[in-house]
């Protein structure tokens, strides 16, 4: 027998355990640390610009051609795009979890290339960018000038030139990006009146710059081939691209016959300024450059953040005077706090388990064995997780906490059986260990396989939910496998070394005290056996009880709200500020500053970073929107004053509700960063029949109004609207052509004056920047300024646009969004207080069903999509777990009926779990479902050993009811030991506060309630079910095969039935528990 080798050679078992532990400790130093496994779907972004174009023009000219080609690219889940009134286009394609981001990028690039032939020339000239996108925030860094000596232009470009690229090279950083639009550009601000007086047009400026600001490659002198012996070879250089404003000022626009010339400085103001002024960054009211740092997939978040901090400290040494930086948000602070709290919970659970085991065993030496064996299993698990490419995260650590109850049971089974053999036979520890292992080796292996059959199938579920389950299931499975190895090697070896023979033990005060405690436990065991004796005589009632428990669990499952993952206090939330359509940037900035100043004074708030001119919800720059990133003080500090992120959000909502000129929308971070932009649900209303944007907006507003009247929904909103004031230019094309003016020249003149026209590039500061021409401020204020623009006809005459265009006012969309190749309106919302996210999604679906007209549909996206997919998989998960457990139990018992009893006993635990969730008001989310899977395993394990002992006695010829009583009596002590240890180990989860408290309570509550029910009800139900099903089995065997299943029962067993259990309670000193 394998265990005998290690009992005789305990140092070999100890060495194996040390090697496993060392491997785990080494892995702990190398394994990536993150809040969650790598479950954020990879994304690829496509960006393009059509300067001066409206949202509808961008959609028609860019979005539709590109999305028609990209749609259906390999591994795509969904795609969404935004076409803005500022001429920008952004498409985000989201792919399946586990797909290769690089391959995704190549596939999208190939599809976009097919669409480029259908794009406007101006768009392709500026370039269509395709790149993989990191969506998992790591940190937000702001560059600021405490003494206000630097403006936004300097701060933004200092960050772009000196900080962003350096941060992008930090190991573990996937992307570093500046939120600002103040990149350097050579801005040519021309004066329309000056151009008119000199008989020039904006196109003349464009042509002059294009011809004189060029990259020159003029060749070489003396380069081969040469017919004679050339002695020298020289490379020729000349003035190519211009590098500063003075050189651009001297560009010649027109050379006159008399030798005079018109230079750019005669008609325009030239300066090194910003490429775009669409957004303005602030930190606590002062100018700032905001840099977002994203984590690379699969990297160590904590190590990457530490690397960023180190690099910023290095860069700070070379900062000019008056420049500083601040890390205004760091996700790893929450991650580190979460990991710290979970590890603390793990240690607390372990200590409580050890205390319970000590109380039940009553022997310090015996307690020492599981105390040593359990850490080996848990620490060794890290080594396997590292090899599998997993990270140390909340899921894997939760799995270890829950695995303690399973892992400790293996060691308890060994120790308890060795103690029992020593007490009954008087054998010395080594011999007793050998005999005990002969009895339990097969059950340990079989039970391990049965439990693996519960967990392993869960690991094959696809998608994000499947990735969460896989991390959990594989962590528990690895811990169980190592625990089984320990139970066959380390635990029996330690029993042979640590335990003492029962004969001749001296009774100290401590020993006598523990004897009394053990005697009390024995009396409880006798009482339990007495109750079981009565119950098995009414075993048929177990079927009624199981039916009642099953019905109760089912009913509770229908009324307990469902969810995806609980929202947490991550120390940060967003505030989106929206002003009326067409509100100017300066007007928006004033309102943002007012709200910013108010929030900064609130209790618990540390910093407020604002980006005026940016809509976080829509993901584009708009003049009437602003974003505020509110960073809170450390959670430990806020908890002293009982302030959570939800309290601050509620206060912000209350204060901003009184602002008449704006609407403020507060958004907590989503449970998984990178999966959705905020908490709550994300919904896409789709126009599936190509109606107008105005009709889509009308339907969206009607849907939002109906949703907000539903009591299960709150703060449902959409920012999509078509009431933005716009001016529509009608070009008289016939008249223009008759005067020799090309409509294309008219459009280019308008674009150059009003929209900002990209001419070409220039080089300075080691970078390449854009050259942009645009009219001066006074030339683009009113409609009258449009009429003053001139174009040149083919005859050389100057033609004012007043004679070629007319202007009319109209209302139109500020932007247009598309989802999966349909024009769409993005709608976001939240569950009402006390309502789960699952109920909110169901309510929104019902509102959609009754409200949406024909031709309109909807799709869920972000966390809502994942939650619905998870909800659809829950039943499959439990069904797979139960099916595989049943099949392995059939193999264990060589019976098709006995395993049914073991599995039916789990209904008590399921009912208890659902009842606990209902009482506490928690949702049946992924964490709760993870706990229920563990509950199935642990409750099954208790039933397996009770039934195994009863089955062995029955096969020895003991009467059926008596065999059930003996099996229950023999396993009562270790079952209660494991159950109490596990239940007490869950207490730190159930009462958790601090980082990830909602997650810890979610995962702990279901198992806590389930194990209480399984311990209080299941231990009585299991022997009853065994009697019923074994009786059916034997009856069927006798009727079908016409012979008894077992040999003739021994008469002495039957005689003992009247006097109680065959194994009478022994005195504590006989059991060796002193």
Swiss-Prot record:
Q: What induces it?
A: Induced in the absence of BepDE.
Q: Where in the cell is it found?
A: Cell inner membrane
Query: Which Gene3D superfamilies does the entry mention?
Result: Multidrug efflux transporter AcrB pore domain (3.30.70.1440), Multidrug efflux transporter AcrB pore domain like (3.30.70.1320), Multidrug efflux transporter AcrB TolC docking domain, DN and DC subdomains (3.30.2090.10), Multidrug efflux transporter AcrB transmembrane domain (1.20.1640.10)
GO molecular function annotations of the record = efflux transmembrane transporter activity; xenobiotic transmembrane transporter activity
Q: What is its main location?
A: membrane
NAD listed as a keyword:
no
Q: Does the keyword Cell membrane apply?
A: yes
The topology of this chain with respect to the membrane is: Multi-pass membrane protein
GO cellular component entries: plasma membrane
Give the transmembrane ranges: 13-33, 342-362, 368-388, 395-415, 444-464, 478-498, 540-560, 876-896, 898-918, 930-950, 975-995, 1007-1027
Give the disruption phenotype, in one or two sentences. Answer: Shows no differences in the resistance profile to different dyes, detergents and antimicrobials.
Per UniProt, the keywords (alphabetical) are: Cell inner membrane, Cell membrane, Membrane, Transmembrane, Transmembrane helix, Transport
- Show the segment(s) annotated as Disordered: 1050-1074
| Pfam families reported in the protein's UniProt record | ACR_tran (PF00873)
Say what the protein does: May contribute to resistance to some drugs, such as deoxycholate, sodium dodecyl sulfate and nalidixic acid, in the absence of BepD and BepE.
Family of the protein in this entry: Belongs to the resistance-nodulation-cell division (RND) (TC 2.A.6) family.
Subunit structure, interactors included: Probably part of a tripartite efflux pump, which is composed of an outer membrane efflux protein, an inner membrane protein and a protein that expands the periplasmic space. Could form a tripartite pump with BepC and BepF.
Question: What name appears for this protein in its UniProt entry?
Answer: Efflux pump membrane transporter BepG
- The species this protein was found in: Brucella suis biovar 1 (strain 1330)
Tell me the classification of the organism that encodes this protein: Bacteria, Pseudomonadati, Pseudomonadota, Alphaproteobacteria, Hyphomicrobiales
Q: Which gene encodes it?
A: bepG
């Amino acid at each position: 027998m394998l265990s005998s080798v290690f009992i005789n050679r305990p140092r070999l078992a100890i060495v194996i355990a040390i090697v496993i532990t060392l491997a785990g400790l080494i892995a702990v130093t190398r394994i990536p640390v993150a809040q969650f496994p790598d479950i954020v779907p990879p994304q690829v972004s496509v960006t393009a610009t059509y300067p001066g174009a409206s949202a509808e023009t961008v959609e028609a000219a860019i979005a539709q051609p590109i999305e028609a080609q990209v749609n259906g690219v390999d591994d795509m889940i969904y795609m969404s795009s935004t076409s803005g009134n500022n001429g920008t286009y952004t498409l985000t394609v989201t792919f399946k979890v586990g797909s290769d981001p690089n391959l995704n990028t190549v596939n999208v690039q190939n599809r976009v290339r097919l669409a480029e032939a259908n794009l406007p020339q101006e768009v392709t000239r500026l370039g269509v960018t395709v790149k993989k996108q990191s969506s998992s925030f790591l940190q937000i860094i702001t560059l600021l000038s405490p003494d206000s000596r630097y403006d936004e232009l300097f701060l933004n470009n200092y960050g772009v030139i000196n900080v962003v690229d350096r941060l992008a090279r930090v190991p573990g950083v996937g992307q570093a990006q500046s939120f600002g639009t103040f990149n350097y550009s050579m801005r040519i601000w021309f004066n329309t009146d000056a151009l008119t007086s000199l008989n020039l047009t904006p196109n003349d400026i464009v042509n002059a710059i294009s011809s004189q600001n060029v990259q020159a490659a003029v060749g070489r002198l003396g380069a081969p081939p040469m017919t004679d012996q050339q002695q020298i070879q020289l490379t020729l250089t000349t003035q190519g691209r211009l590098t500063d404003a003075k050189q651009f000022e001297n560009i010649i626009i027109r050379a006159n016959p008399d030798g005079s010339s018109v230079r750019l400085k005669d008609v325009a103001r030239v300066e090194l300024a910003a490429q775009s002024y669409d957004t303005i960054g602030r930190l606590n009211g002062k100018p700032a450059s905001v840099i977002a740092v994203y984590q690379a997939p699969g990297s160590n978040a904590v190590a990457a953040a530490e690397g960023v901090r180190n690099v910023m400290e290095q860069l700070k040494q070379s900062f000019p005077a008056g420049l500083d930086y601040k890390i205004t948000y760091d996700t790893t602070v929450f991650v580190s706090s979460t990991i710290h709290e979970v590890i603390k919970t793990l240690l607390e659970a372990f200590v409580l388990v050890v205390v319970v085991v000590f109380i039940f065993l009553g022997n310090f030496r015996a307690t020492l064995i599981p105390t040593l064996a359990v850490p080996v299993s848990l620490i060794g698990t890290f080594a396997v997780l590292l090899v599998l490419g997993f990270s140390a995260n909340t899921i894997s650590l939760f799995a270890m906490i829950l695995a303690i109850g399973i892992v400790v049971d293996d060691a308890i089974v060994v120790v308890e059986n060795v103690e029992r053999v020593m007490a009954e036979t008087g054998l010395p520890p080594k011999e007793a260990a050998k005999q005990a292992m002969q009895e339990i080796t097969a059950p340990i292996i079989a039970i391990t396989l049965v439990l693996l059959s519960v967990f392993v199938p869960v690991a094959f579920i696809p998608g994000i939910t499947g990735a969460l389950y896989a991390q959990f299931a594989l962590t528990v499975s690895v811990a169980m496998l190592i625990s089984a190895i320990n139970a066959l090697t380390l635990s029996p070896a330690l029993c042979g070394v640590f335990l003492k023979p029962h004969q001749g033990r001296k009774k100290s005060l401590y020993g006598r005290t523990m004897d009394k405690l053990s005697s009390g436990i024995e009396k409880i065991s006798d009482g339990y056996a007495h109750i079981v004796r009565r119950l098995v005589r009414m075993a048929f009632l177990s079927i009624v009880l199981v039916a009642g428990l099953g019905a109760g669990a089912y009913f509770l499952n229908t009324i307990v709200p469902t969810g995806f993952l609980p929202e947490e206090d991550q120390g940060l939330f967003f505030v989106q500020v929206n002003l009326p359509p067409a509100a100017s940037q300066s007007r928006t900035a004033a309102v943002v500053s007012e709200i910013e100043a108010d929030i900064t004074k609130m209790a618990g708030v540390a910093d407020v970073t604002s980006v005026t001119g940016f809509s976080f919800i829509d993901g584009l720059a708009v003049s009437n929107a602003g974003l505020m990133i509110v960073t809170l003080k450390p959670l430990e500090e806020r908890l002293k004053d009982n302030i959570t992120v939800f309290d601050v959000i509620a206060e912000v909502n209350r204060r901003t509700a009184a602002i008449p000129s704006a609407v403020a929308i507060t958004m907590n971070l989503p449970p998984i960063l990178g999966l959705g932009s905020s908490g709550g649900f994300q919904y896409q209303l789709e126009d599936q029949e190509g109606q107008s944007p105005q009709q889509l907006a009308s339907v969206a507003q009607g849907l939002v109004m109906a949703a907000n009247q539903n009591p299960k929904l709150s703060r449902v909103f959409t920012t999509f609207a078509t009431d933005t004031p716009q001016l529509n230019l009608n070009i008289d094309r016939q008249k223009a052509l008759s005067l020799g003016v090309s409509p294309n020249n008219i459009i280019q003149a308008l674009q150059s004056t009003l929209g900002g026209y990209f001419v070409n590039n220039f080089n300075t500061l080691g970078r390449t920047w854009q050259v942009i021409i645009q009219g001066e401020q006074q030339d683009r204020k009113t409609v009258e300024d449009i009429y003053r623009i001139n174009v040149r006809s083919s005859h050389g005459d100057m033609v004012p646009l007043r004679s070629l265009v007319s202007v009319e006012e109209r209302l139109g969309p500020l932007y247009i969004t598309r989802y999966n190749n349909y024009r769409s309106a993005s709608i976001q919302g939240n569950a009402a207080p006390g309502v789960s996210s699952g109920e909110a999604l169901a309510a929104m679906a019902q509102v959609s069903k009754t409200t949406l007209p024909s031709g309109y549909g909807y799709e869920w996206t972000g966390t809502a999509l994942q939650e619905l997919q998870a909800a659809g998989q829950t039943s499959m998960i439990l069904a797979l777990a139960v099916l595989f457990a049943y099949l392995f139990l059939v193999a264990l018992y060589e019976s098709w009926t006995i395993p049914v009893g073991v599995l039916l006993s789990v209904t008590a635990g399921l009912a208890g779990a659902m009842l606990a969730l209902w009482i506490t008001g928690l949702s049946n989310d992924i964490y709760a479902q993870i706990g229920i899977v563990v509950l199935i395993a642990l409750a099954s394990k208790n039933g397996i050993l009770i039934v195994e002992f009863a089955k062995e006695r029955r096969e020895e010829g003991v009467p059926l009811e008596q065999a059930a009583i003996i099996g229950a009596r023999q396993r009562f002590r270790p079952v209660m030991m494991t159950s109490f240890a596990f239940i007490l180990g869950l207490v730190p989860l159930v009462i958790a506060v601090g980082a990830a408290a909602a997650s810890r309570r979610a995962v702990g509550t279901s198992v806590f309630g389930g194990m209480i029910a399984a311990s209080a009800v299941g231990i009585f139900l299991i022997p009853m079910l065994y009697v019923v099903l074994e009786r059916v089995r034997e009856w069927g065997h006798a009727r079908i095969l016409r012979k008894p299943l077992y040999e003739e029962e021994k008469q002495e067993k039957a005689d003992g039935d009247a006097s109680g259990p065959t194994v009478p309670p022994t005195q504590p000193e006989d059991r060796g528990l002193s």
